[in-house]
Amino acid sequence: MGNASSIVQTINVTGDGNVFKPSAETSSTAVPSLSLSPGMLNPGGVPWIAIGDETSVTSPGALRRMTSKDIPETAIINTDNSSGAVPSESALVPYNDEPLVVVTEHAIANFTKAEMALEFNREFLDKLRVLSVSPKYSDLLTYVDCYVGVSARQALNNFQKQVPVITPTRQTMYVDSIQAALKALEKWEIDLRVAQTLLPTNVPIGEVSCPMQSVVKLLDDQLPDDSLIRRYPKEAAVALAKRNGGIQWMDVSEGTVMNEAVNAVAASALAPSASAPPLEEKSKLTEQAMDLVTAAEPEIIASLVPVPAPVFAIPPKPADYNVRTLKIDEATWLRMIPKTMNTPFQIQVTDNTGTSWHMNLRGGTRVVNLDQIAPMRFVLDLGGKSYKETSWDPNGKKVGFIVFQSKIPFELWTAASQIGQATVVNYVQLYAEDSSFTAQSIIATTSLAYNYEPEQLNKTDPEMNYYLLAAFIDSAAISTSNMTQPDVWDALLTMSPLSAGEVTVKGAVVSEVIPADLVGSYTPESLNASLPNDAARCMIDRASKIAEAIKIDDDAGPDEYSPNSVPIQGQLAISQLETGYGVRIFNPKGILSKIASRAMQAFIGDPSTIITQAAPVLSDKNNWIALAQGVKTSLRTKSLSAGVKTAVSKLSSSESIQSWTQGFLDKVSTHFPAPKPDCPQSGDSGDGSARRLKRDSYAGVVKRGYTR
């Protein structure tokens, strides 16, 4: 395999003295978390310059934007650019007259961090002759004295010295050079990660070890033949050592082993202490919990005053229904011909091509009342259903969506003459095969879709009703005795809102919502039948974020109090003292604590409990408001501590992983043994380095034919 020369040492990858001793304090890290979002990088403003020395900058038109042509005359006086305004690498950059932009300190710090990330792979980049000169963002910056602002009016009161500026061309070329290097590193980075995960190279706590020669042999035996590590083993060794302080190579010339890792700061934050989880983990989890609570907007979801529907609404999410199983009195957006109407009747409708279709209506037929629906996409899937009868096989039959309009309510229809107009808006042909059960024919997955938009129906008559039906249709008349199904709603109907900002409450479109009034106002049946954009679903979605935040932060068990459950306890303590009706029950604090804890645990398991009337505690809006506000306070007042149970559990779990890892590495050393130092091979002259080369017949990746 040979020697590799790096800046600090000469190494022998397959030789003696190398160390493989991963520990929690030297865990691998190479991920540069860059903050390059536009909101962080911009706006830094632009530089402005006075038009003339005699002109007051407060005069109209006294400032103009600086361009690259202004740099020489302004930068000569700046000590940072004493050699001239043009940076040392500017010969490589076109020097055109371009407007300048101000670079924020945040941008400089993050681009510098990106440069550092590339240097993890410097030896490999040099081998490829890619980015032979380490990029330096500061070389492309010029520091000038100027007025700074997005507008001239803002800039005239903001004169600054030594402001970093850059032209768009230089900025683009710099980013392109970084991107080109990252492109060249794509497979290299993957292969390095494969090598680091083929066997455990990190441990969550403590320390593990294995002879490095055994590790190298395992990698040689298992790495893919096209792995770049086989082609560039020396460069890979250096790159791995920079990432992981547990991988150390002996300096052959000095006879010393040094930790080459550059991640000591990050690794220490990732390591647990003897009694607490890693600092980074605690910080991240607290941040996640706070982000969830912020997204839930506790003030909005606990409001006792009306909130505009667009403010309360969430991004629309699809909801699934089986229309045949919904109660008509709960799903107020449905209509049904009474089952007592015993005489089926045939109707004939057309589609947008003028083709005529026949269908039947009968008692029990259901439709969607489009007048109570916001713009919506309907997708009906009959997959897995049978619909077979003695004289009716669904295979090859067609099902369609039909839109009706009539001034007569649907539930009063008894004849085709009562229908104003109707059209087939879409249809599909079914494929079905005989089931394993007798007399059943299973329909394959279907996708009968329709996008409902009110504007398409030209709703000008306020007395006109609009309905959507899913049913079998045929080009010939369908015998009412052969096909007895009232419709084909016994399927999976997915409804997806096409517009955001519209909210319904139990089927009625509303302009505003009082969130606190939603608490405990739905039965499980009415919640199940609610539309996708129902206020209850919006409330549950927001409440789910609160529940997830509690789960991240809280490790209290059943009946145990916690900072997140005691807000409910406080509310219960006061409410039992309030004057009311019936027998008053006074619970001691121990009982109240358990009641509050159970209510919180039920909420974590199913956030919809705040909406349904079945939840005895959180269906009270006062208890819900206390919880929502209390969780926010609990997280805001938390430091970087962790729950007692969480700390103990994670530490004991980490110790079990440490034991497993060491056991695995012991097996590696057993099955891929390192040469014994006291067994020189014939011809050994006694020189350490010569003995190392001769006795290692396996020689790591050298056996694959690579040059030492």
Swiss-Prot record:
GO biological process, alphabetically ordered: symbiont entry into host cell via permeabilization of host membrane
PTM note: Cleaved during the endosomal proteolytic disassembly of the outer capsid. Mu-1 is proteolytically cleaved into mu-1N and mu-1C during the maturation step to generate the ISVP. Cleavage of mu-1 to mu-1C is dependent on myristoylation and binding to sigma-3 protein. Mu-1C is further cleaved into delta (59 kDa), and phi (13 kDa) segments during entry into the host cell cytoplasm. Mu-1 and mu-1N are N-terminally myristoylated. This acylation is essential for the membrane fusion activity.
Entry annotated with the keyword Lipid metabolism: no
CC per GO annotation: host cell endoplasmic reticulum; host cell mitochondrion; host cell plasma membrane; membrane; viral outer capsid
Covalent lipidation (N-myristoyl glycine), chain numbering: G2
Glycosylation sites: N3, N12, N81, N110, N458, N482, N528
Site residues (Cleavage), renumbered to this chain: N42, P43
Pfam family name, one: Reovirus_M2
Gene Ontology molecular functions: host cell surface binding
Statement: the UniProt record of this protein carries the keyword Lipoprotein: yes
Known function: Major outer capsid protein involved in host cell membrane penetration. In the endocytic compartment, outer-capsid protein sigma-3 is removed by cathepsin proteases, which exposes the viral membrane-penetration protein mu-1. Both myristoylated peptides mu-1N and phi are released during infectious subvirion particles (ISVP) formation in the endosome. They associate with host membranes and mu-1N induces permeabilization and delivery of transcriptionally active viral particles into the host cell cytoplasm. Seems to induce apoptosis in the host cell. The viral outer shell polypeptides, of which mu-1 is one, impose structural constraints that prevent elongation of nascent transcripts by the RNA-dependent RNA polymerase lambda-3.
Domain notes: The C-terminal region, phi, determines both targeting to intracellular membranes and induction of apoptosis.
Entry's family note: Belongs to the orthoreovirus mu-1 protein family.
Quaternary structure, from the entry: Heterohexamer of three sigma-3 and three Mu-1 proteins.
Protein name: Outer capsid protein mu-1
Species classification: Viruses, Riboviria, Orthornavirae, Duplornaviricota, Resentoviricetes
Record gene name: M2
